């Protein structure tokens, strides 16, 4: 029982119950309606695996299932009528595994089954078409995977291994397109999906790519990418093809979604790396607002193209799951149908989901982001409690606008949250540390702890914003200014001391270099003086040497005649005079020879010869 109710500022209605906790509701949470076949009516196969859907002219839905046969659902009464395969009666569907359906221009239903052929139903009787060995006409394979009716009421039949068949209902003529044909061959005999463009061409999705078929000429072309060759289409197994109102072709595979803009010859690709919840694209439809809805193996998407100034497109999308009324996360291949009411119906492994674009209510509340926690060096920090000898927070982190951290505290984490409780797991967050990050980083609701390590000392601004379950971002950004103090060796006083020490060191180095240069200059000047003195001495010595050479020859010429005169002169007085002349001439010759010997010694041409002797006669000779 409900004992209290409360409606908050965001429009959520909270209900407090007796012994059963708290419940909440908002019209934007449950966006979709889902139907399932009642379990009490299932007598043999218990599942709601819906493979295909078609709406008849009365507005009833025909649903092909995996083992439960064909269901007719009356939306007004909510009642089901089930049609099962009957071996004993021809007026029944051909098989209980119905994997494809189509409605022709006459209102006739066509059912494709797994290994049981094709069935036509005019509202009264079922007519069966099977692959008859040896027959030139008729169905080429009993596993009919896809059906499509074109503008001329031709029925196109995609089979598992028989290629593509075309039945012209006005003439009863069958046309076949197969892999390996000499002309107009398709890529593969396994045809998974069919669609038609605005020109009447048939788009064929196979296990080996995509083909275009011109029904009037029978011409088959293979889709390899853009005409200019810049974007190449390489996916092989195609789950679904769909032509929209923009003349775009949407191609879904197990590797993501390709969108080909035929008018501008451009290709776009969306996959898990782009942000899609899953790469397996199963079904595609467009609503009246030109939003494209896509069933995947991990929820339902609505994709909105946005054109920029360069005529290129970007794509926004929302994903939905069972928490918002979707049948489940896994949708089936080609299990989608547009209804006369403007609704879309998507079948999956757990029922049928209706999408009514006109009635969907989106959550317009722009939730503010909140910083709810701080950790420093993996230690939780609380207000007014000391950490490492000082208090970091003087009030709760939620109310803090400025934060100072020591150099040893530059490894820190924030926990972020938002005040959006619609579907909190679908919230997203974007954060940026100005002064460190160059771009915003987006994270999911499961990644609410933001960590920074080893930031340099300085002032930063941490900014965070939140996105709600319907992709509405915060109007205001939550900011926190963070100052990381430098270590003691990087403070202003330390830097001033470093500058002074550097100046003194530079001065000492300059003085040292100056003294070395000055000493070198003095030594060079001294060497120049010595060199100059040596040159002067050398000049004098050369002069004396030359003069000595000039003296030596005349002295020799003087002494030789003197010797002869001394021998012939009889007069004692004259002889004494001659001896005096001879002795002084000899002395002068010895001095000349000594001067020449010194020159030889200086030129390293002679060596000093030492000898012993009586110095008295030597001195007497010199004196007298």
What label would you give each PLM region?
Residues 522-567, 597:
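Primarily the dimerization/phosphotransfer
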Residues 609-624:
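A conserved beta-strand-to-alpha-helix junction within the catalytic ATP-binding
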Residues 589, 593-600:
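Short alpha-helical N-box/ATP-lid segment at the N-terminus of the HATPase_c
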Residues 7-10, 55-58, 103-106, 149-152, ...:
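Residue-level detector of Asp-centered blade-edge/turn motifs that repeat once per structural unit
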Residues 599-610:
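Helix-loop junction within the histidine kinase core
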Residues 580-589:
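Short alpha-helical segment of the dimerization/phosphotransfer core of two-component systems
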Residues 1-6, 18-23, 31-54, 87-94, ...:
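Residue-level "micro-hotspots" composed of small/polar
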Residues 566-574:
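Short acidic helix/loop segment immediately C-terminal to the autophosphorylated histidine
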């Amino acid at each position: 029982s409900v004992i209290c109710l409360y409606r908050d500022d965001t429009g959520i209605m909270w209900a407090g119950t007796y012994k059963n906790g708290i419940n909440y509701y908002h019209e934007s949470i449950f966006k979709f309606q889902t139907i399932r076949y009642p379990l009490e009516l299932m007598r043999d196969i218990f599942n709601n695996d819906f493979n295909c859907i078609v709406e008849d002219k009365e507005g009833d839905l025909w649903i092909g299932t995996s083992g439960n046969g064909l269901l007719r659902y009356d939306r007004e009464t909510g009642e089901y009528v089930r049609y099962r395969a009957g071996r004993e009666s021809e007026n029944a569907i051909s098989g209980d595994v119905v994997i494809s359906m189509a409605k022709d221009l006459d209102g006739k239903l066509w059912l494709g089954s797994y290994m049981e052929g094709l069935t036509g139903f005019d509202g009264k009787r079922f007519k069966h078409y099977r692959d008859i060995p040896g027959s030139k006409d008729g169905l080429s394979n009993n596993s009919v995977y896809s059906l499509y009716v074109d503008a001329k009421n031709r029925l196109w039949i995609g089979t598992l291994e028989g290629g593509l068949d075309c039945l012209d209902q006005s003439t009863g003529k069958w046309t076949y397109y197969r892999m390996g044909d000499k002309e107009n061959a398709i890529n593969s005999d396994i045809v998974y999906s069919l669609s038609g463009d605005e020109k009447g061409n048939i788009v064929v999705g196979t296990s080996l790519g995509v083909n275009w078929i011109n029904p009037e000429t029978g011409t088959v072309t293979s889709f390899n990418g853009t005409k200019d060759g810049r974007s190449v289409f390489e996916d092989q197994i195609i789950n679904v093809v769909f032509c929209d109102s923009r003349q775009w072709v949407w191609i879904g595979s197990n590797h993501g979604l390709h969108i080909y803009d035929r008018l501008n010859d451009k290709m776009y690709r969306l996959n898990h790396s782009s942000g899609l919840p899953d790469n397996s694209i199963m079904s595609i439809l467009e609503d009246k607002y030109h939003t494209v809805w896509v069933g995947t193996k991990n929820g339902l998407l609505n994709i909105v193209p946005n054109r920029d100034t360069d005529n290129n497109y970007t794509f926004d999308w929302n994903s939905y799951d069972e928490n918002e009324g979707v049948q489940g996360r896994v949708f089936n291949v080609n299990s989608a149908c547009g209804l006369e009411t403007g609704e879309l119906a998507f079948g999956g492994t757990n029922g049928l989901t209706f999408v009514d674009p006109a009635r969907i209510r989106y959550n317009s509340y722009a939730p503010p982001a909140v910083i709810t926690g701080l950790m420093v060096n993996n230690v939780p920090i609380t207000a007014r409690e000391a950490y490492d000898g000082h208090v970091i927070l003087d009030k709760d982190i939620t109310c803090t606008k400025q934060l100072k951290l020591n150099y040893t505290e530059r490894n820190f984490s924030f926990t972020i949250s938002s005040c959006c409780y619609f579907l909190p797991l679908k919230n997203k967050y974007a954060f940026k540390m100005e002064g460190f990050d160059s771009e915003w980083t987006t994270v999911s609701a499961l990644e609410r702890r933001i960590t920074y390590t080893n930031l340099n000392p300085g002032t930063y601004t941490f900014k965070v914003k939140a996105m709600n379950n319907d992709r509405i971002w915060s109007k205001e950004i939550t900011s926190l200014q963070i100052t990381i103090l430098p270590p003691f060796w990087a403070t202003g006083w330390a830097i001033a001391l470093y500058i002074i020490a550097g100046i003194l060191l530079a001065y000492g180095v300059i003085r040292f270099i100056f003294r070395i240069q000055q000493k070198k200059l003095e030594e060079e000047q001294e060497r120049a003086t010595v060199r100059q003195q040596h040159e002067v001495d050398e000049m004098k010595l050369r002069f004396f040497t030359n003069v000595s050479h000039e003296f030596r020859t005349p002295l020799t010429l003087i002494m030789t005649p003197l010797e002869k005169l001394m021998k012939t002169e009889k007069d004692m007085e004259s002889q004494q005079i001659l001896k005096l002349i001879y002795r002084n001439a000899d002395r002068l010759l010895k001095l000349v020879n000594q001067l020449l010997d010194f020159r030889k010694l200086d030129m390293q041409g002679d060596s000093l010869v030492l000898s012993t002797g009586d110095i008295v006669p030597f001195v007497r000779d010199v004196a007298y």
